[in-house]
Amino acid sequence: MTDAQGKPRIDQTGWLVAHSLAKSFGKRVVVRDVSIAVRRGEAVGLLGPNGAGKTTVFTMIMGLVKPDAGSISLDGREITRLPLFQRGQLGIGYLPQEPSIFRGLSVRGNIMAVLENHVKGKAERHARLEALLDEFSIRHLAKANALALSGGERRRVEIARALASHPHFMLLDEPLAGIDPIAVGDIRDLVAHLKDRGIGVLITDHNVRDTLKIVDRAYILHEGRVLMEGAPDEIVADAEVRRVYLGERFSL
């Protein structure tokens, strides 16, 4: 999956690839020649200390920030200049950290709002709706208003709604922020479920320990560059990663 310079190739299907991304804000260089790749059916972490550039890389992949240099491709198609909504139409889903449920709609209405933009046939829309209600055990909530949901119920509805567009990749922004251990387990189960569906998952989060327990591999950014890429145990064992990010006492 890499070229002669060790960077991800951009001509392969089944991959979401960022190649040699760079970004500056004024005179401050935030991202320097960052290349990452996510394959369908795997979970990848995008981690690093504050100011490492991970949030900027994440938002460039989403389509919210335009890179100064480099490219982004999906299934071999360059999407670098496409906005967020067009990337969504091509198969990139996004689950923000903040609540994103449509508060004035029922659970059924939340999911159907997405299906109506992605599925043409009425019968197929309703079949997909019923399948998602069952898949996420929210059928009993179908008529409930979004405002009446608990935090866990709301999250399940948001995930079901995100999957209504049939994404090939899901970008999870800080999914572990401020949640209790039970909810961490729910996120772990969610990521496993997405992988079983053949969906590639990219996670950025400040909770490095729990993220490394969830992902198959991760990229560690430092001062705007990729410091290391590898499996969680390889990252934890790396002396330089420990020095600048994890600390000597870190363990999984």
Regions found by a protein language model. Give the residues of each.
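Conserved catalytic motifs of ABC-family nucleotide-binding domains
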Residues: 166
